[in-house]
Amino acid sequence: LARIDDDRRVCRLSIPGTHDACTGYGFLPQDTLAGNYIARTQELNISEQWAVGVRAFDLRPDVREEKSTKSSKKAKETKRTLQIYHGEFATQQTFNGVFNVLRDSLQAHPTEFAIIIMQHERSANRDGSTWEAMVDYALAENSDLIVDFRPDLTVGQLRGRILVLSRDTYRPTPRGGYIEGWRFDAEVDWQKPATIRGYAMEGTLCVQDFYNMT
């Protein structure tokens, strides 16, 4: 990205990205066998993807609960983590962990930028009731990196930082942008009604996400 002019609009670029980006880390032990067979879409982790030029990352966080027993009181405590999932399968990376990797990558390469497209990977088998609060807290902790979406956002404004676009809301106004009207249509005419809404501005979006599982 160092070769691209600062005043070039980000929306005019073709940016390499990865689907279910964190599956390259593999899955937690209980999900390894089925996850590798059904849900693994990447062979490289985020650092390795960055090294080969990937700058847009599809993340699917949900709340993972672990119950532990304190030996002194014999009471169970619940630890909640924003784990990255693909469907029912938990990868070995967390939402916060991805930000740590990208922070290090941007500090080493300040002319670059990253885009995160995220959604709540809901499941009837998990309690996601704290998802909104946990996502908002994680993004607030990394607010120095996050850029507010606007349709005329330029490369120069985004260098060294991250544009976070969420398909699900976690607070009234986004930290980055909200994608509204995500489409799964095969027909081009039906792919156009989507929008990206930032804190104060919004832009139209054509979503091409048609797929056929056979």
Segments (PLM) and residue ranges:
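Sec/Tat-exported extracytoplasmic proteins
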Residues: 106-109, 139, 166
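Acidic, His- and aromatic-enriched active-site or binding-groove loops in soluble protein domains
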Residues: 91, 95-98, 136-151
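Short, intrinsically disordered low-complexity segments
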Residues: 153-168
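Long, acidic (Asp/Glu-rich), low-complexity accessory segments flanking structured domains
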Residues: 1-52, 65-108, 113, 172-174, ...
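C-terminal active-site rim and adjoining tail of enzyme catalytic domains
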Residues: 165-214
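Internal, conserved structured core segments that host functional sites
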Residues: 112-135
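Solvent-exposed loop/turn segments at secondary-structure junctions
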Residues: 19-21, 56, 61-65, 120-125, ...
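Structural recognition of the beta-strand scaffold that forms the well-ordered cores
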Residues: 11-16, 55-59, 114-118, 162-166
